Amino acid sequence: MSATQNYGTGRRKTATARVFLRPGTGNISINNRSLDNFFGRETARMVVRQPLELTETVEKFDIYVTVIGGGVSGQAGAIRHGITRALMQYDETLRGALRKAGFVTRDAREVERKKVGLRKARKRPQYSKR
């Protein structure tokens, strides 16, 4: 891999994002679509930009992302995690600030499986005493 780009893999819930940072002007491309086009929700766009705004590198990189699996929230979280890892590969001194903001840690919360005899993972059928 060339030294002109940095790579990071991000995961959240069932979503996986492959993130490439290249020197540029701040364009963010997700699955060959713009950030605004890919995410309809403003909160998802904000989540994706968080590590860049924290490290003040918004205008410094062009970001190319391939993301698969999950929903809107999971994909946004996976992209944020991938951008964070790529930024740390670019400059290790950013790790402290990113760690303090909580972007470095992989959010390990997953959907709990449905159990036999229950309606959902924990919801039980109504109990009848008589």
Curated annotation (Swiss-Prot):
GO terms for cellular component: cytosolic small ribosomal subunit. One of its GO terms (biological process) is translation. InterPro entries: Ribosomal_Su5_D2-typ_SF (IPR020568), Ribosomal_uS9 (IPR000754), Ribosomal_uS9_bac/plastid (IPR023035), Ribosomal_uS9_CS (IPR020574), Ribsml_uS5_D2-typ_fold_subgr (IPR014721). Keywords: Ribonucleoprotein, Ribosomal protein. One of its GO terms (molecular function) is RNA binding. It comes from the Bacteria. HAMAP family: Ribosomal_uS9_B. Belongs to the universal ribosomal protein uS9 family. This is Small ribosomal subunit protein uS9. It comes from Pseudomonas syringae pv. tomato (strain ATCC BAA-871 / DC3000). The lineage of its organism: Bacteria, Pseudomonadati, Pseudomonadota, Gammaproteobacteria, Pseudomonadales.
